[in-house]
Amino acid sequence: MSFWKKSRYFAVFLTAACAMQFCAGCSVPFLEKQESDGSGYLFTASLPANPKSLDPQSATDAASKTIIENLYEGLVELDENGSPQLAAAESYTTSADGLVYTFLLKNDRYWFYDANQDDVVDDDETWKVTASDYAYAFQRIFDPQTQSPYTTMFSCLQNADAVQSGQLDPSEIGVRAVSDTELQFTLSRPDAEFLSNLASTAAMPCNENFFQQTKGRYGLDKESVASCGAFYLRLWFYDQYGNQNQIFMRRNAVNAKARSVYPTNLTFQIRKSSDEAAADFTDGTSDLMTSSVYQPQYMESDNYSVTATRSVTLGLIFNPDDTAFANAKIRKALSMGIDRANIGGNSSGDLLPAYGLIPPAIHWNGTSYRDTYPDAQTAYDPDAALTLFQQGMQELGRESLDSAKILVCASLMDCDNLHDVIQTWQEVFGFYIGIEEVSESDYWDRLQSKNYTVAVCGITASYDSPAGVLEQFSSRTNPFYYANGTTDAASRHCTSAVRKRNSSKMRPAGTIPSG
């Protein structure tokens, strides 16, 4: 969800709960018109962490993507309904078989690199964005040396597997610049999500000459970033021991008129946690706030502008090294032992039951995925759950579970209904599991070190697609060290099997969706 007071905005992620999953969401419309159009304004926001990289073909963290979206412009962008709209592209056509996409680029899009840092556009500091810049970006995605996390997203491209495995040169990927203003994509199979995926940060252009000049530093510091979007990077200062860290961006004059850019400057205070970022909004330091937790002081006030979407699913995750909770029957029994109908009753409407991993805010073919594929209901069946639980205990040769606690971070998620889940488990299975609340930094440290038994974790998409949710469970990238070859294979074939993957993800995996 997002909120503004007068010129201040607050974003909040609402949640939906299910087998142990909850949904939430947020948007950060810096250029959205409120009481005025924002012309000439300086907007300030706070990031909960320092961006890891401003390389669009590699960055995955939210802080990095926030900056990248203001630095670069792609061929298309998504509107408020998740439908792709033309951005840097003037037009496009699709072949009858859905395998060839041809884009014509606009002639008024430019790169800008303020080499002498005088905030003036000199002739030698700007050059046109061309089709080759987009082609090179996709070559980088599939170049094995890049190790880009976005190969699955664009696995439909011709020669994707062969290039990624090193059998073919990256230049053989199915993207070519026909001319400076004409770009052609060739797919090996139709992909209904391809056009929407072109709105992701991964599909932003990359100028090969500039990339080579950075000598391996591309996107890692201010001197290694060129802008082709609404703003350019003026300052990126970060000292892990300091508290004056910030990113300062100025309006990109060469693109401002064509893109109708309203603010003159954007300032991002770099904080160490979501709590610190929230405190900036409370004391008036920042104009915008995003949150995955219901904030009544903003939500229930007429003084703030609020935007909310259900884009996060909360789920229970289990330590893969824990013998008891690694047992599939015990995990399934716990899922069946959750009365999801009662989830969200006391949550002020921000928490709803969730029966699958993909939240309502995710789109598929321009509509909500859940409108097309509703959640498969997981029935509350305490008798069957107890029977399955006892079978699991017999397989383990145990009579009871060891004492354990569920790891939670209150600043990241709404866990009020967790007490109801625990009480139901005690009634059904005869054991009690506690709650351990930790700080945001400790929470992530504990997950990464696998120092937990059970934890509540928020699952959201890295991009607006069902595949963007399921890819969070990749054995290579997920934060809770869950590994499953079947899930990885399903994620690689997300376009043709997305509905099946959603079901298989929810049940055999070490995750129980709840709200």
Positions of PLM-derived features:
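N-terminal lobe/hinge region of extracytoplasmic solute-binding protein
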Residues: 46-97, 104, 226
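Structural transition elements
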Residues: 351-392, 413-415
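Alpha-helical secondary-structure segments
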Residues: 132-136, 180-186, 264-265, 312-360, ...
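Gly/Pro-rich hinge or "lid" segments in bacterial periplasmic/extracellular proteins
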Residues: 170-172, 176, 180-181, 186-265, ...
